[in-house]
Swiss-Prot record:
Membrane topology: Multi-pass membrane protein
Protein name, per record: UPF0756 membrane protein YeaL
Domain of life: Bacteria
Main location: membrane
Localization terms from the record: Cell membrane
One GO CC term, this protein: plasma membrane
Keywords per UniProt: Cell membrane, Membrane, Transmembrane, Transmembrane helix
Lineage: Bacteria, Pseudomonadati, Pseudomonadota, Gammaproteobacteria, Enterobacterales
Cell membrane keyword on record: yes
Signal sequence annotation: none
Family, per entry: Belongs to the UPF0756 family.
InterPro entries xrefs: UPF0756_TM
Length: 148
């Protein structure tokens, strides 16, 4: 039996490798393994909890320098007195807000996820971008199409 979904996943994984987007490629390969094994029974759980777990892991990675001490408290305090750091804080707030809108949009309009993924892969492949923005991209899309 021909599995179109598997073919699409393989194509997206190939795009991930070609564009040096190993995060996307490895993620898709893991999903392929889940799909073709008895682990496929976990898909409802992955669909429900995957994004939350991913955000938790991402937050751990971002906060690790503070927790490890490699980013000393004095540096954090000084960030409130430098105009460039204040701009960075403001942009961080805006981007976090956009990411929140993106999560809502991806949950309510999952058909947009494929377009966001293809756009991210193309951005990495054609413009030497970095694959960090699907949630932010979804947030920007929500500003255009609405987040319902």
């Amino acid at each position: 039996m021909f599995d179109v979904t598997l073919l699409i996943l393989l194509g997206l994984a190939a795009l991930g490798f070609v564009s040096h987007n190993t995060t996307v490629a490895v993620s898709i390969l893991v999903l392929i393994i889940v799909r073709v094994t008895p682990l496929s029974t976990f898909f409802p759980w992955i669909e429900k909890q995957g994004l939350t777990i991913g955000i938790i892991i991402l937050t751990i990675g971002v906060m690790a320098p503070i927790a490890s001490g490699s980013l000393p408290p004095s540096t954090l305090i000084h960030s409130f007195f430098n105009w460039k750091s204040l701009v960075a804080i403001a942009v961080g707030v805006i981007v976090s807000w956009l990411g929140g809108r993106g999560v809502t949009l991806m949950g309510s309009q999952p058909q947009l996820v494929a377009g966001l993924l293809v756009g991210t892969v193309l951005g990495v492949a054609l413009f030497r971008g970095v694959p960090v923005g699907p949630l932010i991209a979804a947030g920007l899309v929500s500003l255009i199409v609405g987040k319902q």
